[in-house]
């Protein structure tokens, strides 16, 4: 997935699944299946349901994505 063919969207984690997979509800209402990026896994970033995250979606498959950033709680 190159940088020119990704869509970055914001969403909320609604469910934690096995193997570092998460179900994320995007701000537009769609639900996608997302995995944690390698950089977040390497730095031991913990994700729990309710966290606000930024997800990268491929233009070829809009049902799967990669979690690239966890927003700080406000």
Curated annotation (Swiss-Prot):
Transmembrane segments: none annotated. Coiled coil: none annotated. GO terms for cellular component: cytosol. Keywords: Cytoplasm, Initiation factor, Protein biosynthesis, RNA-binding, rRNA-binding. SMART domains: S1. GO terms for molecular function: ribosome binding; rRNA binding; translation initiation factor activity. Its main location: cytoplasm. It comes from the Bacteria. NCBIfam families: infA. Belongs to the IF-1 family. This is Translation initiation factor IF-1. The gene is infA.
């Amino acid at each position: 997935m190159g940088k020119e063919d990704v869509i970055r969207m914001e969403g909320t984690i609604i469910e934690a699944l096995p193997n570092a997979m998460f179900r994320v509800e995007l701000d537009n209402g769609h639900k996608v299946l997302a995995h944690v990026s390698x950089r977040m896994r390497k730095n031991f970033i913990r994700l729990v349901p309710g966290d606000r995250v930024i997800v990268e979606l491929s233009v070829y498959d809009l049902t799967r994505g990669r979690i690239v950033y966890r927003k700080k709680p406000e």
